Amino acid sequence: MPTINQLIRQPRVSARVKSKSPALENSPQKRGVCTRVYTTTPKKPNSALRKVAKVRLTNGFEVISYIGGEGHNLQEHSVVLLRGGRVKDLPGVRYHMVRGALDTQGVKDRKQARSKYGTKRAKAGKK
């Protein structure tokens, strides 16, 4: 236990909080260009083909980003918008694509949670 004089000379230093999405550099989103679009398999016990893309950001970082929703139109050289948010069963994937922004289209025929997938509201059908 330090004395009060020791604390006056050298105060306690609080631990620095480490960012979970360092490539965003404290921005809410960042723009980037897809360098590779591919599928990968999740960790045990899950099984799927998850759609991901390697993206070079405007600040020079190269990160792996998850493409949410059913179906996508992305290919190499597509310009995309990234947000933070990891995918628990994909190691190294710490970013999500923002659907419906820049070159990324929204999810087709989406009815619920549309804002998360960049889908416009459908026209009211006949009853």
Swiss-Prot record:
Region Disordered: list its residue ranges: 104-127
One GO biological-process annotation of the entry reads:
translation
**Oligomeric form and interacting partners:** Part of the 30S ribosomal subunit. Contacts proteins S8 and S17. May interact with IF1 in the 30S initiation complex.
Q: What is this protein called?
A: Small ribosomal subunit protein uS12
User: Function of this protein?
Assistant: With S4 and S5 plays an important role in translational accuracy.
Q: Which gene encodes it?
A: rpsL
Organism of origin is: Herminiimonas arsenicoxydans
Highest taxon, organism lineage = Bacteria
Q: Which GO terms describe its cellular component?
A: small ribosomal subunit
Positions where 3-methylthioaspartic acid occurs in the chain:
D89
Pfam families with a match to the protein in the record: Ribosom_S12_S23
Q: Which family does it belong to?
A: Belongs to the universal ribosomal protein uS12 family.
The molecular function terms of the Gene Ontology recorded here are: rRNA binding; structural constituent of ribosome; tRNA binding
What does the UniProt keyword field contain? Methylation, Ribonucleoprotein, Ribosomal protein, RNA-binding, rRNA-binding, tRNA-binding
Q: Where is the composition biased (Basic residues)?
A: 113-127
